[in-house]
Amino acid sequence: MQTGDTYKIGVDLDGTISEYPDFFRLFTKAMAEAGCKIYIITDRPPGTESDVAAELHHYGITYHVIKITSNKAAFIQQEGISVLFDDMDHYFRHLPQEVAVFKIRQNYNFDFQRSIWRD
């Protein structure tokens, strides 16, 4: 869960930061200033870290680590990340209960007219 006094926070890029850049700009800055370590975890093509860094700079996102992986759950457990923001269930479905997950609602994962999550 928590490592010493430092929370490790994972944040997805596509469908998360990209949809709410103003919130995540403020959030990542505040959390980093509070001593948290911010991981940007994205399932982009391997070798695109510099493109991701440029996009994060454009959004004004504060971060410490960029990780490109399709197996986010394994990376999160390996690094001891205790909080995740993501929009896609399959990335966090197999995380242990100790990892707090904040799911981002989008048209493709939430039916706003019926007020229910989509499968």
Task: Give residue spans per PLM region.
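Hydrophobic anchor at the start of a short beta-strand
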Residues: I38, Y63, S82, V99-F102
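Phosphate- and divalent-cation-binding pockets in alpha/beta enzyme and binding domains
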Residues: T48-D51, F75, R93-H94
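Alpha-helical substrate-recognition element adjacent to the catalytic core
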Residues: M1-S70
